[in-house]
Amino acid sequence: DPYINIDAGTFSPYEHGEVFVLDDGGEVDLDLGNYERFLDIRLTKDNNLTTGKIYQYVINKERKGDYLGKTVHVVPHITDAIQRWVMRQALIPVDEDGLEPQVCVIELGGTVGDIESMPFIEAFRQFQFKVKRENFCNIHVSLVPQPSSTGEQKTKPTQNSVRELRGLGLSPDLVVCRCSNPLDTSVKEKISMFCHVEPEQVICVHDVSSIYRVPLLLEEQGVVDYFLRSLELPIERQSRKMLMKWKEMADRYDRLLETCSIALVGKYTKLSDSYASVIKALEHSALAINHKLEIKYIDSTDLEPSTLQEEPVRYHEAWQKLCSAHGVLVPGGFGVRGTEGKIQAIAWARKQKKPFLGVCLGMQLAVVEFSRNVLGWQDANSTEFDPKTSHPVVIDMPEHNPGQMGGTMRLGKSRTLFQTKNSVMSKLYGDTDYLEERHRHRFEVNP
């Protein structure tokens, strides 16, 4: 990722979507969450390389005197550091078999021509000669817009971006065209001619019924065969048993009829990427029980009495959505805004006996709600919102350092031991002695 941030930990969810947490506590872009889920692998924070991280690494080496007094430049020092980082990470096992990976996939974010991408593009230009042609394949993803007024697929943006990329010393081996409808043969041939690739190297990824159709789409267009040839991979061309199972799952997803609706009550509901992992978990759960998922996004501030005074229509619409859902999920969040609305939703779910799941702040607020309305502790609160409360049912943890925002939470995989065998949670986890889940929070329920 070419941004200057060291990691994704302090991003606003509105700007970059959710922050994805890895086993080792790395706070990374949500794309790494997609890679982990789709490939069933476990990544570390070093799998996410940002401009900020590489500059910090090189500057630290310079401060220690590792460059022996030389002037430190973007080329070769930054570019060499990028290449060494990639080579180092490419050898680290990422799945349970513990074997060294045969292929390393590198996603370079941003757009060709971005100033901040330049050191990375130059690094990979050099890299392709170091590792030889048969070990390097460059896939260029480009948008092929289709204005509704004319219906014509426009290839100019693709031509221009490929020309610019070639000018920087990288030639695409595959041009992957993202479009709303399948590419016409004439459009494919045009892209092939102007982008200096064969027509079979122009891959069309058009809109499909579900994301599970995309690997099947790529397989149909011979992408696997292309990789086997160009990278000389030592893999036998065999019947795709795995993709047959995958196709069954994609077909099952498209045939779902019964709907299950979940109200997601949060602060950042205007951008669904803010809760990407929660939404994916709900989708997978719905598919497992053969139901189509309908998520009703509810901004928690719309449930608060103040909204009834200012915008009664929004208030009633929000409550109508909540009441019509089969279950309620309150995800995590930071800060006091919208917390009273979440507590209102939690109280309603408890009284109506609606299935409810609280994650992170959602769970903490469920404890606050129960303390106030069942135990009668009217001022019960989290010390995050009311440090002077006489009933601090949620408190900050010993790991928390209030001074600095970045990297001051309980982060990454943590083991939780069950104290009692007959709890609801223990049964849900299959009567195990402990569970291991990933954490990202500064506060916990007061023991």
Swiss-Prot record:
N6-acetyllysine modifications at: 61
Keyword DNA damage: no
Domain Glutamine amidotransferase type-1: 261-447
Keywords attached to this entry: Acetylation, ATP-binding, Cytoplasm, Glutamine amidotransferase, Immunity, Ligase, Nucleotide-binding, Pyrimidine biosynthesis
Matches recorded under CDD domains: CTPS_N, GATase1_CTP_Synthase
Role of this protein: This enzyme is involved in the de novo synthesis of CTP, a precursor of DNA, RNA and phospholipids. Catalyzes the ATP-dependent amination of UTP to CTP with either L-glutamine or ammonia as a source of nitrogen. This enzyme and its product, CTP, play a crucial role in the proliferation of activated lymphocytes and therefore in immunity.
EC number, UniProt record: 6.3.4.2
Family matches, as PANTHER family: CTP SYNTHASE, CTP SYNTHASE 1
MF GO annotations: ATP binding; CTP synthase activity; identical protein binding
Localization in the cell: Cytoplasm, Cytosol
Active site feature: 360
Pathway: Pyrimidine metabolism; CTP biosynthesis via de novo pathway; CTP from UDP: step 2/2
Protein name (record): CTP synthase 1
Organism: Cricetulus griseus (Chinese hamster)
Pfam families documented for this protein: CTP_synth_N (PF06418), GATase (PF00117)
The organism's place on the tree of life at top rank: Eukaryota
Gene Ontology annotations of biological process type: 'de novo' CTP biosynthetic process; B cell proliferation; CTP biosynthetic process; pyrimidine nucleobase biosynthetic process; T cell proliferation
Top-rank EC class of the record's enzyme: ligase
Signal peptide positions on this chain: none
GO cellular component: cytoophidium; cytosol
Catalytic function, reaction form: UTP + L-glutamine + ATP + H2O = CTP + L-glutamate + ADP + phosphate + 2 H(+)
Activity-regulation annotation: Activated by GTP and inhibited by CTP.
Family statement drawn from the similarity comment of this UniProt entry: Belongs to the CTP synthase family.
